[in-house]
């Protein structure tokens, strides 16, 4: 138990220590200031901008920024879709893997361009090396960079005033890839290789075991994809077992690096925001609220798993119970990681929009599974994905400012800018897209007989498997309750739709809000006379409960039919 506390403390300290230097670095990159990596990144950026031409030089309005973002995503979608359909005739395919069916290729292409990485296929048998490297790995970089661009555009809109532009998408995209994601990923990949993660394009090995049977050992360019999988909060595994596979996550060191990588950029953006708007206290307040939410989720999930079998009452179980004091739920977990390493990793993964797992979520106790759902259901704002976590949290921040100001009889304002009705419309649009999307698609799937046939469990747990799939898809997480066989035409198409709506619907609202904020006057006098101090402890509490009440209650009835009912059924066995 002491070792678990030490690991947790080390993890939190590491994230806190990374936040300021990485946040400052991101600030310098997007403010065109000198950085230590200019010598490496600038040549790539020059070639990239030369290819784009004039479109990369002019500042863009919110509408132009969003149009460029969508145009890029459409091109990326077509590119990935074609490769997945034709991978059977493309090179670097030693296993002779055939092209995907159109519904599955559609689902996979949407999944990777939206930074979801939902996988209705098994990586080692469903995708060639060529597709892994040129289609999926590339999207791991650029889809993460797209989320980062949106967050930076939003931060600019708060810092700037009385102007119409929020930056240039194409320029921001290049900076996100060449200055931030690519250099850090290279370092992480090298560490992974030294830890035993393979990086090759060899055919799978056929070996004879001591038992006299033949075993197939997969190979591939794993280290390079694994690095950006975590750093870009993508989560799509090279193997079906994801980070439970010893080739993806062979040691405790790689497990720790993956967890830190998942939170690194999202945590740093809180400091970037504070530094950019000239109020670092505001950034640390955001960091603090995120951290408290994370700790609560981790504690509940860990306790649920450490005592996950206490409800069993047979004599044999009672004999063991009397010896160890409690029964931990080790089903679906790697013995080399144990319960705490598993719950810590999966709390990190579901809090961010990563979706990578080092244990089987479907085997978790119902309450632990519910916490994984809640981490996503509140909008992935517990640090969250690269960029997406920050702009999701900012929507709740705006709502808390609006509610708090009205409660004390003041006109709502944030950092000297008046918050008006139009701003709140975009805020609520962003916050309501997810629950509407999830509840509609889950309700439809729950009454379709063909979907029932894809479930390995019935009743409340079967409903939880369906609910989890659409929560994960709409929030661009990508993790799953594996009891749902997702490779059907209906699930491939509807989950793809939920991913598109959850990603681009929210981005549209965020960028439109940014377009509104950037035009406003910034009155420091207004900020000073306002009684609502947005850096105070009381405001932090207001934001905390706004997230829980608005984010959590919208999905609570569905949770009642799924994991809560599932837990009650177990308690009365």
Curated annotation (Swiss-Prot):
Q: State the membrane topology.
A: Multi-pass membrane protein
GO terms for MF: P-type potassium transmembrane transporter activity; potassium ion binding
Gene Ontology annotations for the cellular component aspect, listed alphabetically: plasma membrane
Kindly give the InterPro entries that the UniProt entry links to this protein. Answer: KdpA (IPR004623)
Which positions, given as ranges, span the membrane? 6-26, 66-86, 135-155, 177-197, 257-277, 283-303, 382-402, 428-448, 493-513, 537-557
Record keywords: Transmembrane helix included?
yes
Q: Does the keyword Manganese apply?
A: no
Q: Which Pfam families match?
A: KdpA
Kindly state which keywords UniProt assigns to this record, in alphabetical order: Cell inner membrane, Cell membrane, Ion transport, Membrane, Potassium, Potassium transport, Transmembrane, Transmembrane helix, Transport
> Could you tell me which HAMAP family the record lists for this protein?
KdpA
Family named by the database record:
Belongs to the KdpA family.
Q: What does this protein do?
A: Part of the high-affinity ATP-driven potassium transport (or Kdp) system, which catalyzes the hydrolysis of ATP coupled with the electrogenic transport of potassium into the cytoplasm. This subunit binds the periplasmic potassium ions and delivers the ions to the membrane domain of KdpB through an intramembrane tunnel.
Query: Assembly state and interactors?
Result: The system is composed of three essential subunits: KdpA, KdpB and KdpC.
What is this protein identified as? Potassium-transporting ATPase potassium-binding subunit
Q: Which species expresses this protein natively?
A: Francisella tularensis subsp. holarctica (strain LVS)
């Amino acid at each position: 138990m002491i070792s678990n506390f030490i690991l947790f403390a080390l993890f939190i300290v590491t994230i806190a220590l990374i936040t300021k230097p990485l946040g400052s670095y991101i600030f310098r990159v997007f403010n065109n200031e000198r950085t230590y990596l200019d010598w490496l990144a600038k040549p790539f950026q020059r070639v990239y901008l030369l290819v784009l031409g004039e479109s990369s030089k002019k500042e863009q309005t919110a509408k132009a920024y969003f149009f460029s973002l969508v145009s890029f995503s459409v091109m990326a979608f077509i590119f990935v879709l074609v490769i997945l359909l034709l991978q059977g005739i493309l090179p670097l395919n030693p296993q002779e893997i055939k092209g995907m069916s159109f519904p599955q290729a559609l689902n996979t292409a949407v999944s990777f361009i939206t930074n979801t990485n939902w996988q209705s296929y098994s990586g080692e048998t469903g995708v060639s090396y060529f597709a892994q490297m040129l289609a999926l790995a590339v999207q791991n970089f650029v889809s993460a960079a797209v989320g980062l661009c949106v967050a930076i555009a939003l931060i600019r809109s708060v810092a700037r005033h009385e102007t119409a532009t929020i930056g240039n998408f194409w320029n921001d995209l290049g900076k996100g890839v060449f200055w931030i994601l690519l250099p850090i990923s290279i370092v992480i990949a090298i560490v992974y290789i030294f830890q035993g993660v393979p990086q090759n394009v060899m055919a799978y090995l056929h070996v004879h075991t001591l038992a006299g049977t033949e075993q197939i050992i997969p190979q591939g360019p794993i280290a390079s994809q694994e690095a950006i999988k975590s750093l870009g909060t993508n989560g799509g595994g090279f193997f079906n077992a994801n980070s439970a596979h010893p080739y993806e996550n062979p040691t405790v060191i790689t497990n720790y690096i993956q967890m830190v990588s998942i939170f690194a950029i999202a945590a740093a953006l809180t400091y970037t925001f504070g530094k950019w708007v000239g109020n670092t206290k505001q950034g640390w307040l955001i960091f603090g609220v995120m951290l408290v939410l994370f700790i609560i989720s981790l504690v509940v999930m860990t306790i649920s798993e450490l005592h996950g079998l206490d409800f069993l009452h047979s004599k044999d179980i009672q004999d063991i119970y009397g010896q160890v004091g409690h029964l931990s739920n080790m089903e679906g977990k790697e013995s080399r990681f144990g319960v705490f390493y598993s719950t810590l990793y999966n709390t990190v993964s579901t809090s961010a929009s990563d979706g990578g797992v080092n244990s089987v979520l479907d085997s978790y106790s119902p309450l632990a599974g519910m916490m994984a759902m809640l981490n996503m259901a509140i909008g992935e704002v517990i640090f969250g994905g690269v960029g997406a976590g920050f702009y999701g949290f900012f929507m709740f921040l705006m709502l808390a400012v609006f509610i708090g100001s009205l409660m004390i009889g003041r006109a709502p304002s944030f950092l000297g800018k008046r918050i008006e009705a139009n701003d709140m419309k975009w805020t609520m649009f962003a916050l309501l897209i997810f629950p509407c999307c999830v509840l509609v698609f889950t309700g439809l799937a729950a009454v379709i007989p063909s979907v029932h046939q894809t479930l390995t469990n019935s009743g409340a747990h079967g409903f939880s498997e369906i609910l989890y799939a659409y929560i994960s898809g709409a929030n661009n997480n990508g993790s799953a309750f594996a009891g749902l066989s997702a490779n059907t035409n209906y699930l491939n198409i509807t989950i793809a739709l939920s991913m598109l709506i959850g990603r681009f619907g929210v981005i549209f609202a965020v960028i439109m809000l940014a377009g509104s904020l950037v035009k406003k006057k910034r009155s420091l006098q207004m900020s000073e006379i306002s009684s609502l101090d947005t850096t105070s402890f009381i405001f932090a509490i207001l934001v905390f409960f706004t997230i829980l009440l608005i984010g959590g209650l919208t999905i609570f009835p569905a949770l009642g039919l799924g994991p809560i009912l599932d837990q009650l059924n177990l308690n009365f066995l």
